[in-house]
């Protein structure tokens, strides 16, 4: 009888000990979400020791990776850079590479080396297997995006909106992405053309069309103003990481 009572008491102690263990584990699991609920600004400051950049009093962290927000920023830089290089060519008669060499005092060979190094760095960063190319939120939305010409070969130039991924006229972020991509391609090909021919973007355009700068001046002014306005216009719409903020 005494053995039975001691066995029951031991079993009760084991049950209470397990309950205490469960309580401790539950308490520990409740603390973890607080650690995971840090904002992006706090993570940026913890990782770098620096406050996140701020625009108009609103802080935002810098995220590496091929996200739409980063591509929008790079596209804006390309539009501003392309416009500034065209204005510089009108004033000096020199292309972007020659202007860069004039400002820095570097010769053509050194400038070409810097440009090639920059291109190589971006290519390596883009294809490096260990680099994080997409944030999880961007990956989750890939399946929800409408198919483009790379996903569906039936989409051709006969359907320009689907082919270029735009929704019509207007300063939306989707349209600005397209304009930014066009500016990046145009700027890149103008630099390649200048490295091959020694002529800037405007001189290359004159060679291709046979028109002088005087004939194309009005269209050029409209093009430059459009790029500058598109670069500084905030537009409408949101991206994934902005909606989750």
Swiss-Prot record:
Residues 1-25 form a transit peptide. Gene3D superfamilies: Chlorophyll a/b binding protein domain (1.10.3460.10). It is found in: Plastid, Chloroplast thylakoid membrane. The chain crosses the membrane at residues 72-92, 108-128, 185-205, 217-237. It is a multi-pass membrane protein. The keyword Transmembrane applies. Induction: Induced transiently by high light stress (at protein level). Keywords: Chloroplast, Membrane, Photosynthesis, Photosystem II, Plastid, Thylakoid, Transit peptide, Transmembrane, Transmembrane helix. GO terms for biological process: nonphotochemical quenching; photosynthesis. Belongs to the ELIP/psbS family. Required for non-photochemical quenching (NPQ), a mechanism that converts and dissipates the harmful excess absorbed light energy into heat and protect the photosynthetic apparatus from photo-oxidative damage. Seems involved in the activation of NPQ, possibly by promoting conformational changes required for activation of LHCSR3-dependent quenching in the antenna of photosystem II (PSII). This is Photosystem II protein PSBS1. It comes from Chlamydomonas reinhardtii. The gene is PSBS1.
């Amino acid at each position: 009888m005494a053995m039975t009572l001691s066995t029951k008491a031991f079993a009760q102690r084991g049950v209470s000990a397990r309950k205490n263990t469960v309580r401790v584990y539950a308490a520990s699991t409740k603390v973890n979400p607080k650690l995971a609920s840090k904002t992006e600004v706090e993570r940026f400051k913890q990782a770098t020791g620096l406050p996140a950049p701020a625009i108009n009093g609103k802080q935002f962290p810098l995220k590496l990776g091929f996200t739409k927000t980063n591509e929008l920023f790079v596209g804006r830089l390309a539009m501003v850079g392309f416009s500034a290089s065209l204005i510089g060519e009108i004033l000096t008669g020199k292309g972007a590479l020659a202007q860069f060499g004039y400002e820095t005092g570097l010769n053509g060979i050194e400038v070409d080396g810097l440009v090639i190094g920059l291109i190589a760095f971006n290519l390596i960063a883009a294809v490096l297997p260990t680099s994080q190319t997409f944030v999880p939120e961007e990956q989750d939305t890939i399946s929800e995006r409408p198919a483009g010409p790379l996903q569906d070969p039936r989409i051709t130039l006969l359907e320009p909106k689907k082919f270029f991924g735009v929704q019509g006229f207007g300063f939306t972020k989707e349209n600005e992405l397209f304009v930014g991509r066009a500016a990046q391609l145009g700027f890149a090909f103008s630099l390649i053309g200048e490295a091959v021919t020694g002529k800037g973007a405007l001189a290359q355009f004159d060679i291709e069309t046979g028109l002088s700068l005087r004939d194309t001046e009005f269209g050029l002014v409209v093009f430059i103003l459009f790029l500058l306005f598109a670069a500084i216009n905030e537009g409408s719409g949101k991206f994934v990481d902005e909606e989750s903020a």
